[in-house]
């Protein structure tokens, strides 16, 4: 009897497991799940703007939220959303794909795309060939939101060397080893289109079928061009300086192989955007060139 009494006393003492009211537990769980749902819903509704506005130069929350970014139904290596926005005239005859943030540490490239979305939404009087613009501000969100931001994606791949140019398997690794001395920032990856981010952009080229691709980079302060059509001589203060092609690059694949003109903008500073007026002038120059050189009809594609 004594042992039984002691056992019962111990069972109710310090070593006993606490008991929970199941109704309270269910209520707390429901509240937590609802809170998580609200947070996720807010992030989706604002297009990830809390993250963008805290990371990018010259991108405040109102600018980002006004962009109205949508989930492009694509994810990075780490599962981050790739956001985009279409600005399209009802009778658009041209399709232009604008990409920023291919390299995550080129923050200004993503910032300028946000400013261009705002400009694209403003009506323009002199546009005989209306345009369907598709903007992707940050193709490489894992690189962008790393601390510090880094050029490559989460797998350490330079996305601008991962496109399936002819003889990629032969040329890309040779170039990386001999010309860059195995620079890890420029590793082309184990195979072409090995990365979800480059596969997404490749898919956009196939499905959206752009007449022009604009790829925004930094920090070399020049304007590059690959493909058919007469290139723009300048955009704002950036002058044409064709620097050549690289195995696996978007310019090589899109402009040379697929025959889709690729304008590559190299902003002069990766951490700071040009002045707003300068970004506007670059936009106006791009629109005028698009109308002058591409407005007569689509460029032949392969």
Residue ranges of predicted features:
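Conserved beta-strand scaffold positions in the cores of enzyme catalytic domains, especially
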Residues: 69-70, 84, 98, 135, ...
């Amino acid at each position: 009897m004594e042992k039984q009494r002691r056992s019962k006393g111990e069972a109710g003492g310090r070593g006993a497991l606490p008991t929970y009211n199941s109704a309270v537990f269910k209520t707390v769980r429901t509240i937590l799940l609802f809170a998580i749902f609200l947070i996720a819903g807010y992030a989706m509704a604002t297009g990830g703007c809390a993250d963008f506005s805290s990371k990018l130069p010259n991108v405040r929350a109102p600018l980002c939220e006004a962009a109205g970014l949508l989930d492009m139904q694509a994810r990075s290596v780490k599962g981050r959303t790739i956001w985009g926005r279409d600005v399209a005239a009802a009778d658009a005859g041209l399709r232009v794909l604008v990409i920023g943030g291919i390299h995550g540490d080129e923050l200004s490239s993503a910032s300028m795309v946000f400013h261009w979305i705002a400009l694209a939404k403003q009506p323009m009087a002199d546009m005989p060939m209306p345009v369907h613009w598709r903007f992707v501000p940050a193709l490489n969100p894992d690189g962008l939101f790393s601390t510090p931001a880094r050029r490559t994606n989460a797998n350490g791949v330079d996305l601008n060397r991962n496109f399936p140019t002819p003889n990629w398997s032969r040329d890309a690794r040779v170039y990386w080893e001999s010309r860059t001395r195995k620079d890890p920032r420029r590793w082309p990856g184990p195979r072409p289109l090995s990365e979800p981010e480059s596969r997404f952009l490749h898919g956009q080229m196939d499905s959206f079928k752009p007449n022009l691709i604009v790829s925004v980079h930094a920090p070399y302060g020049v304007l590059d061009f690959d493909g058919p059509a007469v290139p723009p001589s300048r955009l704002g203060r950036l002058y044409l300086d064709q620097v050549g092609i690289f195995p696996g690059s978007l310019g090589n694949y899109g402009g040379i192989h697929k025959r889709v003109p690729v304008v590559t903008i190299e902003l002069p500073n990766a951490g700071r955007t040009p002045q707003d007026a300068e970004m506007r002038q670059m936009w106006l120059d791009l629109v005028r060139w698009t109308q002058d050189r591409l407005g007569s009809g689509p460029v032949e594609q392969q």
